[in-house]
Amino acid sequence: GSTLLEQMSLHGVRHAPGSLEANDFFLANDQRHGALGSFVRADEHDLSTLGDHPLRSHGGLSEQQLPLLLSR
């Protein structure tokens, strides 16, 4: 089957399966001073494929500087 990101067809998003807190994560890159995303509303999006996985977001003033993790 296809992954949630493949189903969503998000351009510019890279999915990186990992074991960080037993959750997968994805990275979305945008231009400087840009913004990504919007509020997720159940009446506008099919969230049934998420199962028990939580939605998480970053973007508050206290979270503007995020650490960069690289793995090779």
Swiss-Prot record:
This is Phosphonoacetate hydrolase. InterPro entries: Alkaline_phosphatase_core_sf (IPR017850). Its EC number is 3.11.1.2. Unaffected by EDTA or Ca(2+), Co(2+), Cu(2+), Mg(2+), Mn(2+), Ni(2+) and Zn(2+). It comes from the Eukaryota. Optimum temperature is 52 degrees Celsius. It comes from Penicillium oxalicum. GO terms for molecular function: phosphonoacetate hydrolase activity. Keywords: Hydrolase. Signal peptide: none annotated. Monomer. It catalyses: phosphonoacetate + H2O = acetate + phosphate + H(+). Optimum pH is 8.3. High activity between pH 7.5 and 8.6, rapidly loses activity below pH 7.0. Loss of activity below pH 6.3 is irreversible. Gene3D superfamilies: Alkaline Phosphatase, subunit A. Unlike bacterial phosphonoacetate hydrolase, does not require zinc as a cofactor.
